[in-house]
């Protein structure tokens, strides 16, 4: 479980996060939505340890990370998987080598053990025969699946996904959504997804938090988003074509 309590962050004197408090539960896909500039990417980076908050508290399994030693923080980082917006694969490495990379970096596994684990992860994302290929050989959706395989290689307790459907067609986006959701539930991972995709909200939103101008304005399930009694959320949600079509049939 991850708890953010009154988290604040400023850039050049401008408040980007203004007292955000959210609890993220294991085994759930926790989505952050909001307009550009709402603070959702900054919030995700703070949760993932890529940025430090100016004030507020972050608790991982009840432990305040600001009180942890360097070694204890490294231990949490090793339990964390990150799925970057572009996939961030190493083009000079094969698919297998990409998935093996965090294993060799953090656990110093021998090649045989790392290859076996990489094969398991590629099997889980339905790419069992792609290990010898290079990222340039892959479609956008396949690259995202390889990135997911790499993110789960260390069997993380926490998974942070930044716009995982960016640049994908609707059918591939649905596949990625269901893959993330399935892995989250299967392994009991605390997953946080930053997205603007309403399909994702409705498909996998176990918990959805709506940020507006750096504040957490609303929280509920993906299905509750469409009927929420919140004018700010409503103006954001029903500006999307999908939500407009759904509202027409409600």
Per-segment meaning from a language model:
Residues 153-157:
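A short, proline-enriched helix->beta-strand linker immediately N-terminal to the Walker B motif
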Residues 170-172:
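Helix N-cap at the start of a conserved alpha-helix in ABC-type nucleotide-binding domains
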Residues 64, 111-129:
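Conserved ABC ATPase "signature" region
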Residues 56-64:
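Conserved ABC transporter NBD signature motif
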Residues 134-138, 142:
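Conserved ABC ATPase signature
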Residues 48:
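Helix-to-loop junction immediately C-terminal to a conserved catalytic motif
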């Amino acid at each position: 479980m991850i708890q953010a309590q009154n988290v604040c962050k400023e850039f050049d004197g401008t408040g980007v996060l203004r007292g955000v408090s959210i609890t993220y539960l294991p085994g759930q896909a926790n989505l952050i939505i909001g307009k550009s500039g709402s603070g959702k990417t900054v919030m995700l980076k703070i949760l993932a340890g890529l940025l430090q908050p100016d004030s507020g508290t972050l608790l991982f399994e009840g432990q305040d990370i600001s009180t942890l030693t360097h070694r204890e923080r490294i231990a949490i980082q090793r339990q964390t998987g990150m799925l970057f917006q572009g996939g961030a694969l190493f083009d000079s490495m094969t698919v297998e080598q990409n998935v093996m990379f965090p294993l060799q970096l953090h656990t110093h596994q021998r090649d045989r053990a790392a290859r076996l684990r990489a094969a398991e992860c590629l099997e889980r994302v339905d790419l069992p025969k792609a290990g010898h290929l290079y990222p340039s050989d892959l479609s956008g959706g396949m690259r995202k699946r390889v990135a997911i395989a790499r993110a789960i290689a260390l069997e993380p307790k926490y998974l942070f996904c930044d716009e995982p459907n960016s640049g994908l067609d609707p059918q591939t986006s649905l596949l990625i959504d269901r893959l993330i959701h399935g892995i989250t539930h299967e392994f009991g991972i605390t997953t946080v997804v930053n997205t603007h995709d309403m399909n994702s909200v409705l498909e996998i939103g176990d918990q959805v938090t709506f940020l507006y101008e750096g504040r957490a304005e609303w929280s509920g399930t993906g299905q509750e988003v469409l009927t929420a009694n919140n004018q700010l959320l409503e103006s954001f949600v029903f500006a999307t074509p999908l939500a407009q079509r759904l509202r027409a049939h409600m």
